[in-house]
């Protein structure tokens, strides 16, 4: 069984697995963290997820997630693999977000803030 909910369009269609497809999965992981472990595409079957992602569908912004973090996640889900950021770019963007404190006020109750 394949982890369809974490797979990029090219992985789903062609069985291609690269750093870029891993970045896609990282975006889904960020989404899971911000939803405190919710199942990606919760109302869809694996087959529906496959069709949805192929058609350009993406996960919605989690409630209370900072806009800048959602932009990072969305960039991980670009349809064209070469348009996705590298892991290094993702880390740099997240570090800037954490260091600046921007977006912290957007976090709703129930989210854990780690200052460590």
Model-predicted segments: where are they?
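Activation segment
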Residues: 14-19
């Amino acid at each position: 069984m394949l982890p369809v909910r974490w797979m990029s369009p090219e992985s789903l269609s062609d069985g291609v697995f690269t750093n870029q497809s891993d970045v896609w999965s990282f975006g889904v992981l960020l989404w899971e963290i911000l939803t405190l472990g919710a199942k990606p595409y919760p109302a869809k079957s694996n087959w529906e997820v496959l069709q949805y992602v192929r058609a350009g569908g993406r996960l919605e912004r989690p409630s209370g997630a900072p806009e800048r973090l959602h932009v990072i996640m969305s960039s991980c889900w670009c349809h064209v693999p070469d348009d996705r950021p590298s892991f290094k770019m993702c880390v740099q963007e997240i570090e800037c977000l954490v260091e600046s404190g921007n977006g912290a006020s957007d976090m709703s109750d129930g989210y854990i803030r780690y200052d460590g």
